């Protein structure tokens, strides 16, 4: 007897015995998702989550109505971190099937690497895994990758990454990846993508309480998300030269670790006083943004699980978008809307740049005072390391990267949210 369950779509309401608001009902034929006349993709994703939660490990999407977006919605909800469910669907139109498979590859890689333990993904391993993934989806010969590690970081002047990671026994690393499909080694760099890759964040000497540390294997979620976004863009046909810079370190406590009151002198001459070692993401991103600016690209995007303030403001359902470039922000929000992902703007203004005073350095790594806008001042800090911060730069504070517990739509763990938005934004901007 087959243990596979067929799942159908219906615009009709469920029979009364299933409840007035039921989105799922069962019969001898299998399960039916009741999507209403509006083709509710949220209902499809919630049904996928419910079936996974019931331990149904073999599903066939059957009958009429299954298109690219509905199959994708079901897959998102049905996928969990602890086991590999088997999902079948009738072949879609060729272009839709290609797109679906590319989405699955990109978001599976993103979700899987975020869900791995910090023991499995050290800073150098993160850089290596990201480079291997991009090489696996890019045309042969279009990718070159360099990993700068340990004291070589100091040789190249990447003081922030080295300082944050020096308390760990696991060496820090910067991935410098060059995707160049043009065939011209002198082609201009169209965009630089910068990701925060903190593979575990204890908070350092500004140590996190235990309940806030349990999800800190996912503090490299920005690096994973922006890598997945590039991978999907490549599979969608991206034809411009892109550089990916991942800033990878482990924020730990030891006799060598960064201390409060230490001052970092960056490659651009800026000095930063460390007033909180748990505000470390911005310290590593500063190096990546300086590298990016030196490539003179048209576009710089950075992604980071940077602040609790963004998560407090938006919850798990949106990433925060901060930028001085209103037109680019609008285009990013449009891309997110088209890809059905959550992205929401938070304010970033010149006065935020003045909220990082230090008595001993050019800047403090945190803002002072009561009720300071933490997400905005974190982005303002980053702006000091972008040459033309008013144009062509956006910062994504990835509040929706990871869920500590499951919801009605998502399993616990990584979501992959943002990968599609980044891919579309790159493709659209490259036109």
Curated annotation (Swiss-Prot):
Mn(2+) 1 binds at residues 201, 278, 280. Mn(2+) 2 binds at residues 196, 201, 219, 280. One of its GO terms (biological process) is proteolysis. Belongs to the peptidase M17 family. GO terms for cellular component: cytoplasm. Transmembrane segments: none annotated. Gene3D superfamilies: Zn peptidases. Keywords: Aminopeptidase, Cytoplasm, Hydrolase, Manganese, Metal-binding, Protease. Homohexamer. This is Peptidase B. It comes from Vibrio atlanticus (strain LGP32) (Vibrio splendidus (strain Mel32)).
